[in-house]
From Swiss-Prot:
Belongs to the DEAD box helicase family. DDX5/DBP2 subfamily. Its EC number is 3.6.4.13. Residues 546-559 have a biased composition (Gly residues). Residues 182-357 form the Helicase ATP-binding domain. Keywords: ATP-binding, Cytoplasm, Helicase, Hydrolase, Nonsense-mediated mRNA decay, Nucleotide-binding, Nucleus, Ribosome biogenesis, RNA-binding, rRNA processing. This is ATP-dependent RNA helicase dbp2.
């Protein structure tokens, strides 16, 4: 990390955290009354702009995934008098101090991981009955000796202390992923589960985890967790914690949630007291292990939730480092909405003779309960189109709408615009402080602020019931992100609506989008269909695609960011 010498040093490079350069960290010399904030341009961050269009360079940006900070700019935007050295390489260096584990399983204590006892009613079902049930519920399985699915909660054979909590929730029957996933996970085998967001997969691994914990020896002082759940975002990690807290209450199972963006103190105290379950994002967990605050020697049940999203976000090196700290005979459950080659490779490397359950086709497809409306517009029409849709949607005061933008800057700009126009909108993205993100999510969940603006980083971690509409102000980089975005609505058997503004800038994605719409039997705008003739073949997974950047640095002062603190305009619209 270098501060840039000479005539106008650059700001500190990006990379101290996920894709965020520091805001105005090293401001150059006395010219700097307006030096732009340093990086924080998301996944593919460029350096912050310099004073007067380039005098005195801005902070260095991240590389393609925002992990390696670029050098600070020099006088005259980088050439000139002594540009800064290379920026921090924090994320890629994470785990460099982890001790290599040499596992001699013959000297390690044995542990129980097979708990499934097939109910006589399930055992009596013929293969024909089982095949019919799987076909009705779009369940496909792969692998040898896969247990039959269960059709009721009682058939799953959970102990009474688990069943009490399940029945208290009032669920009518297991979801398809639970029907097949519970017997698989309870059998102690490594499992891959592919299912859409909102399919009930969290409970599919939570309940077997509770059974697993209760069969293990009690934690001794200094022991790390027995169950480790890795998740891509803070919001998803908190959601998982809520489920584990709810269903582990009667067993007095302790848990903690370990993620960045908040002070470490409370997390360190939880780990020191001892927790049976740790839900974590990869970066903060490695930090805790490297600093000796916890260890993974006791982990015998590992969950990788939303594995595809973690890889999309560039966490693969960190995941591999973490998995190297866990005994290889553990039970591993990997859950994903999609099954691309990168996820397949990870499963092949770290899961042992796994069995697999897929809900629906392995071809990426949208939830058919969601009505998809795609409008071809010009860039300057977007705000007007959005306002017109909002006026119609918010005629029903119970509606909730989640608006997606491509960058943090646009998210903040749109939020200010809507608030000044009288709409109760709030925004959430990676540059917001954790307490602000929590507050925004709560305002949205409770309906106090029924309009939330978000970037893709937040898209997977947001679990809010009864989102009636998703609005894509900016189209994402690829059709996978599109499907994940619109999957925020139409959950748990409900219907939903997704409205997307599509411009000529998105033309390369037209063919992929039309394929998604066609598969879901949606109406296709003729102008969109016309684009497919000229637009090329689409962008695939887009690992090195256009950065989500553009947002300003976090900036000091105040409890909440300026966009969320913008006053509502006089003509309240809701």
């Amino acid at each position: 990390m270098s501060y840039g010498g000479g005539y106008g040093g650059g700001g500190r490079g990006g990379g101290n955290g996920y894709g965020n350069g520091d805001s105005s960290y090293g401001r150059g010399n006395s010219y700097s009354n307006g030096y732009s904030n340093g990086g924080s341009n998301g996944y593919s961050g460029g350096g912050g702009g310099g004073y007067g269009g380039g005098r005195g360079g801005g902070g260095g940006g991240g590389n393609v995934n925002g992990y390696s900070g670029g050098g600070g700019g020099g006088y005259g935007g980088g050439g000139g008098y002594g540009g800064g050295g290379a920026g921090g390489d924090r994320m890629n260096n994470l785990g460099a101090n982890l001790q290599k584990q040499n596992w001699d399983l013959s000297t390690m204590p044995k542990f129980e991981k097979s708990f499934y006892k097939e109910d006589p009613v399930v055992a009596a079902r013929s293969e024909e009955d089982v095949a019919k049930f799987r076909a009705q519920h779009n369940i496909a399985v792969q692998g040898p000796n896969i247990p039959k699915p269960v059709e009721t909660f009682d058939e799953a054979g959970f102990p009474a202390y688990v069943m009490t909590e399940v029945k208290a929730q009032g669920f009518p029957a297991p979801t398809p992923i639970q029907s097949q996933g519970w017997p698989m996970a309870l059998s102690g085998r490594d499992v891959v589960g592919i299912a859409e967001t909102g399919s009930g997969k969290t409970l599919t691994y939570c309940l077997p985890a509770i059974v697993h914990i209760n069969a293990q020896p009690l934690l001794a002082p200094g022991d790390g967790p027995i169950v480790l759940v890795l998740a891509p975002t803070r919001e998803l990690a908190v959601q998982i914690q809520q489920e584990i807290t709810k269903f582990g209450k009667s067993s007095r199972i302790r848990n903690t949630c370990v993620y960045g963006g908040v002070p470490k103190g409370g997390q360190i105290r939880d780990l020191a007291k001892g927790v049976e379950v740790c839900i974590a994002t990869p970066g903060r967990l490695i930090d805790m292990i490297e600093s000796g605050k916890t260890n993974l020697r006791r982990v015998t049940y590992l969950v990788l939730d939303e594995a595809d999203r973690m890889l999309d976000m560039g966490f693969e090196p960190q995941i591999r480092k973490i998995l190297g700290q866990i005994r290889p005979d553990r039970q591993t459950c990997m859950w994903s909405a999609t099954w691309p080659k990168e996820v397949r490779a990870l499963a092949s490397d770290y899961l042992n003779e796994f069995i697999q359950v897929n809900i629906g086709s392995l071809e990426l497809s949208a939830n058919h309960r969601i009505t998809q409306i795609v409008e071809v517009v010009s860039e300057f029409e977007k705000r007007d189109k959005m306002t017109k849709h909002l006026e119609k949607i918010m005629e029903d005061k119970d509606n909730k709408i989640l608006i997606f933008t491509g960058t943090k800057r646009v998210a903040d700009d749109i939020t200010r615009f809507l608030r000044q126009d009288g709409w109760p909108a709030l925004s959430i993205h990676g540059d917001k402080q954790q307490n602000e993100r929590d507050w925004v999510l709560n305002e949205f969940k409770t309906g106090k602020s029924p309009i939330m603006v978000a970037t893709d980083v937040a898209s997977r971690g947001i679990d809010v019931r009864n989102i009636t509409h998703v609005f894509n102000y900016d189209y994402p980089n690829n059709s996978e992100d599109y499907i994940h975005r619109i999957g925020r609505t139409g959950r748990a058997g409900q219907k939903g609506t997704a409205i997307t503004l599509f411009t000529t800038d998105n033309q390369k994605q037209a063919r992929d989008l039309v394929n998604v719409l066609t598969e879901a039997k949606q109406v296709i705008d003729p102008r969109l269909a016309e684009m497919t003739r000229y637009g090329g073949g689409g962008g695939g997974r887009g690992y090195g695609g256009r950065g989500y950047g553009g947002g300003r640095g976090r900036g000091g002062g105040g409890n909440f960011s300026s966009s969320n603190a913008a006053p509502l305009g006089g003509g309240r619209r809701w």
